[in-house]
Amino acid sequence: MDVEDTVKKLNLKFRNIEGERLILAITCDENKNVLMVAFMNEEALKKTLETGYMHYYSTSRKKLWRKGEESGNVQKLIKFYRDCDGDALLFIVEQKGVACHEGYYSCFHYKIEDGELKITGEYYSKR
């Protein structure tokens, strides 16, 4: 697969966010549980397609990063989809370990209940 050609054919609508051309990346496991939402620039997308492992763009650190490069909790790409508008991508991955830097399987472990923010295992549990 020619990565340059694939990216071009996707006809993506990168958005200008904090001075960078970015696209929303939604990442799910094989059971379609949402693991995380992050941004990608074109380089991160190309690296993901070239290596088969998820790469993202950090808006806070202003750099490309490979998921799990420090923790070992890598995400192996299985397949991906483009949304109807071309402004978001959905990635299905094989998750090794946890996805969240706080030690939870998913970044969506906070629940809003009675106006309060609570950490809960109802949606995803710590593994």
Curated annotation (Swiss-Prot):
Record InterPro entries: PRA-CH (IPR026660), PRib_AMP_CycHydrolase_dom (IPR002496), PRib_AMP_CycHydrolase_sf (IPR038019)
Keyword Transmembrane helix: no
Keyword terms: Amino-acid biosynthesis, Cytoplasm, Histidine biosynthesis, Hydrolase, Magnesium, Metal-binding, Zinc
Domain of life: Archaea
Chief localization: cytoplasm
GO biological process, one term: L-histidine biosynthetic process
Catalytic activity: 1-(5-phospho-beta-D-ribosyl)-5'-AMP + H2O = 1-(5-phospho-beta-D-ribosyl)-5-[(5-phospho-beta-D-ribosylamino)methylideneamino]imidazole-4-carboxamide
UniProt pathway annotation: Amino-acid biosynthesis; L-histidine biosynthesis; L-histidine from 5-phospho-alpha-D-ribose 1-diphosphate: step 3/9
This enzyme's EC code(s): 3.5.4.19
GO cellular component: a single term: cytoplasm
GO molecular function: magnesium ion binding; phosphoribosyl-AMP cyclohydrolase activity; zinc ion binding
Residues annotated as binding Zn(2+): C84, C100, C107
Gene3D superfamilies found in the cross-reference section: Phosphoribosyl-AMP cyclohydrolase
Function: Catalyzes the hydrolysis of the adenine ring of phosphoribosyl-AMP.
Family: Belongs to the PRA-CH family.
Complexes and interactors: Homodimer.
Descriptive protein name: Phosphoribosyl-AMP cyclohydrolase
Organism: Methanocaldococcus jannaschii (strain ATCC 43067 / DSM 2661 / JAL-1 / JCM 10045 / NBRC 100440)
Lineage: Archaea, Methanobacteriati, Methanobacteriota, Methanomada group, Methanococci
